[in-house]
């Protein structure tokens, strides 16, 4: 008897082929995809957008829409072909023996149900023999297992009352409700910050060790792959180009595409830390920047605050509660520099950037650009900020009007920006797209006809064509694949040098911030926790929160 017969794989995918049928004709999505998953194993599937990695997971789960057709191969679970099962058999399999964790925890949870009720509902759905009391007890146990504090009390809370990391833990609890044999985790940490990502990955690893569940981890992040996977499949254009143990993939990649992915991962450089506290603030969030000569300053933000008022329930019932998104945040931005803002979700970094750009109002404080002070309690159209500050947003697909051609989008930026009245808008647009590496043939297309990297280049061009004094870039690379990230970072650096641009660069990726920025502010819970030169923050700051962010970075890509 062979080793494979003694320890048969839990899941076997062999020569899987899929195509998508549309009025334009069939398109091959997957071609000859083969792999096995053992019991208690974590298998990583990595590749860029469009590689087919999520499609593999959906094929296993039986979640593909009718226009997808299987053209070849088989999918076997525990010795039985999944693709030969009836719809009822697949329904029984899904949730009970194979579960899924998806990227967007917000979309995975019902905002009108308490989180406990959602876990309890899943427990009842996968085990019809459970009483309501037993299902509630199991739901509380699951919330405790995934690390939700005070699960009995928080059982009654709604999704909006939890942090992003806690919501993802709740989604994991729901996935565990049926005691599955396999969890397919599709980009489960992509929307999370470094410290929260590390916590979620450690939780998945602990669950594998404790329960023996197998995990298929779909991601485009080599850092995630390096942290917890046992083996890796590298996919490109619907095919597996390389497969091996994780250590072999990371240390001895054979395929050029794998080498390209590894080379594109930004490295965080952390020299040996000293305990010196000069050249920056390490006293824990006074928010007061170091002195900079007034002649060198372009922007000064002083004691900017933002207070939110929201009801305790998502449908507007109950007394409104006040919470601070920002509390007395100050910043001094030297002319011609790039200043980074780093922080976890909910730290207030995007709120602050939107106030600087005139897209949100503040409840206190003031902003001065040059010699002009702006009333940030008013909207950007009323206080004059709009146009002087432009913003590059995180998701280019959302920030571009799908009904406008690229040329129309860029010309609109000229009409409403500081360069309004330009005698030849078409010439200005053509020069800009040339400089940003976009083909002029793309100008007649609409956003859905462009790749993610091309769309983000358009967003950069749109911001620059308005001739702003300051650009606020809010997570401009986090929605992009790692190789495209590297291209956009390189492009931004070239543009900053060429234009003499002043930029606020918002990110939770410390390696990119280190590469881009001359000074860095660390945000937490709406306050400035730490700040200083980039060299100080990454080499010499002894602030515990700053160190925790740095230590959360995958060690494989820290040097």
Model-derived regions, located:
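ABC ATPase NBD coupling module
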Residues: 82-99, 117, 125, 132, ...
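Conserved ABC transporter NBD signature motif
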Residues: 69-81, 365-375, 385
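Conserved ABC ATPase "signature" region
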Residues: 134-153, 424-441, 550-551
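Conserved ABC ATPase signature
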Residues: 157-162, 166, 446-450, 454
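Helix-to-loop junction immediately C-terminal to a conserved catalytic motif
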Residues: 61, 65, 357
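A short, proline-enriched helix->beta-strand linker immediately N-terminal to the Walker B motif
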Residues: 177-181, 465-469
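ABC ATPase "signature
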Residues: 240-245, 252, 528-532
């Amino acid at each position: 008897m062979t080793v494979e017969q003694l320890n048969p794989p839990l899941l076997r995918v062999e020569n899987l082929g899929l195509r998508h049928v549309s009025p334009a004709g069939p398109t091959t999505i997957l071609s000859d995809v083969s792999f096995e998953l053992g019991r208690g194993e974590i298998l990583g599937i990595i590749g860029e957008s469009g590689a087919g990695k999520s499609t593999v997971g959906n094929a296993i789960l039986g979640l593909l829409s009718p226009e997808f057709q299987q053209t070849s191969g088989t999918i076997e679970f525990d010795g039985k072909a999944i693709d030969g099962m009836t719809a009822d058999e697949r329904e029984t399999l899904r949730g009970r023996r194979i579960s899924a964790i998806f990227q967007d925890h917000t979309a995975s949870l019902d905002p009108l149900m308490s989180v406990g009720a959602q876990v309890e509902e899943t427990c009842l759905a996968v085990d019809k023999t459970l009483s309501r009391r037993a299902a509630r007890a199991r739901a509380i146990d699951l919330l405790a297992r995934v690390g939700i504090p005070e699960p009995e009390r928080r059982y009654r809370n709604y999704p909006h009352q939890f942090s992003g990391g806690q919501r993802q833990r709740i989604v994991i609890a729901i996935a565990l409700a049926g005691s599955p044999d396999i969890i397919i985790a599709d980009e489960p940490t992509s929307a999370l910050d470094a410290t929260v990502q590390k916590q979620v990955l450690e939780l998945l690893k602990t669950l594998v060790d404790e329960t023996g569940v197998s995990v298929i981890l779909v991601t485009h992040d080599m850092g995630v792959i390096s942290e917890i996977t046992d083996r890796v499949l590298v996919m490109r254009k619907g095919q597996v180009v390389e497969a091996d143990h994780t250590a072999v993939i990371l240390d001895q990649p054979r395929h050029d595409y794998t080498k390209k992915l590894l080379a594109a991962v930004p490295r965080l450089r952390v020299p040996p830390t000293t305990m010196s506290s000069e050249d920056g603030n390490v006293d824990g969030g006074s928010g007061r920047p170091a002195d900079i000569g007034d002649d060198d300053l372009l922007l000064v933000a002083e004691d900017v605050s933002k207070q939110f008022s929201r009801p305790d329930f998502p449908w507007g019932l109950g007394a409104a509660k006040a919470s601070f998104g920002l509390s007395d945040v100050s910043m001094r931005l030297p002319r011609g520099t790039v200043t980074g803002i780093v922080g976890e979700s909910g730290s207030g970094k995007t709120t602050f950037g939107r106030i600087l750009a005139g897209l949100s109002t503040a409840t206190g404080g003031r902003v001065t650009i040059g010699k002009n002070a702006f009333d940030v309690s008013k909207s950007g159209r009323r206080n004059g900020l709009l146009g002087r500050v432009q913003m590059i947003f995180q998701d280019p697909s959302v920030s571009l009007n799908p009904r406008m051609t690229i040329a129309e989008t860029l010309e609109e930026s000229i009409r409403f920006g500081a360069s309004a009245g330009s005698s030849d808008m078409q010439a200005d647009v053509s020069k800009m797209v040339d400089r940003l590496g976009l083909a002029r043939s793309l100008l007649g297309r609409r956003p859905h006809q462009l790749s993610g990297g091309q769309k983000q280049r358009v967003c950069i061009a749109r911001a620059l064509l308005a001739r702003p004094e300051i650009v606020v870039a809010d997570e401009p690379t986090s929605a992009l694949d790692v190789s495209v990230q590297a291209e956009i970072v390189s492009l931004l650096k070239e543009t900053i040098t060429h234009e003499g641009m002043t930029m606020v660069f918002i990110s939770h990726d410390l390696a990119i911030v280190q590469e881009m920025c001359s000074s860095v502010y660390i945000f937490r819970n709406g306050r400035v926790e730490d700040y200083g030169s980039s060299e100080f923050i990454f080499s010499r700051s002894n602030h515990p929160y700053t160190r925790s962010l740095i230590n959360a970075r995958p060690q494989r890509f820290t040097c």
